[in-house]
């Protein structure tokens, strides 16, 4: 039978993943201002269409990024939960053996 173990550093890794995801959301929010505030290069119709297309594509990309960051945040929280559960079980088992 193979011994199961877990490294307590997993909780720190989960926290870092969650923090990185939150930074990604913040960066996306900052980028939204630049993407939606693009002014057409000229007064012609092509420039207006290009600016509109850029804005539309940028908004879609940022929405995709926000979704990905949300999934990363959830994954980080899941790793933290698993690490917490392992620690609680290990502490409980250690208490039984200490008695």
UniProtKB/Swiss-Prot annotation:
SUPFAM superfamilies: PE/PPE dimer-like (SSF140459). InterPro entries: PE-PGRS_N. It comes from the Bacteria. Keywords: Secreted, Virulence. It comes from Mycobacterium tuberculosis (strain ATCC 25618 / H37Rv). Residues 1-90 form the PE domain. Plays a major role in RD1-associated pathogenesis, and may contribute to the establishment and maintenance of M.tuberculosis infection. Together with PPE68, stimulates the secretion of IL-10 and MCP-1 from human macrophages, via the interaction with human Toll-like receptor 2 (TLR2). The keyword Cytoplasm does not apply. Pfam families: PE. This is PE family immunomodulator PE35. Its main location: secreted. Belongs to the mycobacterial PE family. It is found in: Secreted; Cell surface. GO terms for cellular component: cell surface; extracellular region. Disruption phenotype: Inactivation impairs expression of EsxA (ESAT-6) and EsxB (CFP-10). The keyword Secreted applies. Could be used for serodiagnosis of both pulmonary and extra-pulmonary tuberculosis. Interacts with PPE68. PE35/PPE68 complex interacts with human TLR2.
């Amino acid at each position: 039978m193979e011994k199961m173990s877990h490294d307590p550093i997993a909780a720190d890794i989960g926290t870092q993943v969650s923090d990185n995801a939150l930074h990604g959301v913040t960066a996306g929010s900052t980028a939204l201002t630049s993407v939606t505030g693009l002014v057409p290069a000229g007064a012609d119709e092509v420039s207006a269409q290009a600016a509109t297309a850029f804005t539309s594509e940028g908004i879609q990309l940022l929405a995709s990024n926000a979704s990905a960051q949300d999934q990363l945040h959830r994954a980080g929280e899941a790793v933290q939960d698993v690490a917490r559960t392992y620690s609680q079980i290990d502490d409980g088992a250690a208490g039984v053996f200490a008695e």
